[in-house]
């Protein structure tokens, strides 16, 4: 009889611990999935027509996005966009925002956009926006570096 009670006691402990473990995991997954989408960091153009010339964006926690033209051949960069960034507040996997141009930074940059605002979209790991230069417009696609 003692063996049966001991076996039932052990079984009850195992079931209790297993149930507790599952609840903690579910709670942890829920917490992780509720964190807002994080777009901070460095993003690099993936659809450039050149392997050595492309755009690179830095999204900072101070609420700014800076985009530079990068030219690896002569190791140079030139400002294209400096503007505002509104961080996502939800965990949705798509996001869009309108950035306001920081004209103090862009007005003296030769290759900078003169637009007052620029629309950005994040979807499936890609940030996209339209860029115009020399009368040609292209949708730029960036992926996290």
Question: Where do the PLM segments sit?
Answer:
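Positively charged n-region of N-terminal signal peptides that target proteins for export
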Residues: 1-4
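Sec-dependent N-terminal signal peptides
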Residues: 6-13
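C-terminal motif of bacterial Sec signal peptides marking the signal peptidase cleavage site
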Residues: 15-19
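Bacterial signal peptide processing site
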Residues: 21-23
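Tryptophan-anchored aromatic micro-motifs
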Residues: 29-53, 142
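Short, solvent-exposed coil/turn segments at beta-strand boundaries
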Residues: 39, 57-65, 90-91, 120-127, ...
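Short, structured interface segments that constitute the first stable element of a domain
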Residues: 42-77
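Contiguous, well-ordered beta-strand patches that form the walls/edges
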Residues: 49-53, 72-126, 133, 138
């Amino acid at each position: 009889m003692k063996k049966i009670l001991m076996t039932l006691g052990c079984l009850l402990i195992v079931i209790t611990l297993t149930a507790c473990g599952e609840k903690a995991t579910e709670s942890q997954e829920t917490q992780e999935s509720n964190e807002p989408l994080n777009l901070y960091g460095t993003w690099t153009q993936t659809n450039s027509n050149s392997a050595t010339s492309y755009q690179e964006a830095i999204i900072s926690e101070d609420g700014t996005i800076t985009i530079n033209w990068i030219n690896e051949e002569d190791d140079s960069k030139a400002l294209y966009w400096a503007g505002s960034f509104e961080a996502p507040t939800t965990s949705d996997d798509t996001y869009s925002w309108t950035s306001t141009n920081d004209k103090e930074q862009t007005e003296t940059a030769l290759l900078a956009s003169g637009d007052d605002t620029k629309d950005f979209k994040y979807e499936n790991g890609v940030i996209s926006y339209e860029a115009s230069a020399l009368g040609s417009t292209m949708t730029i696609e960036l992926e996290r570096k």
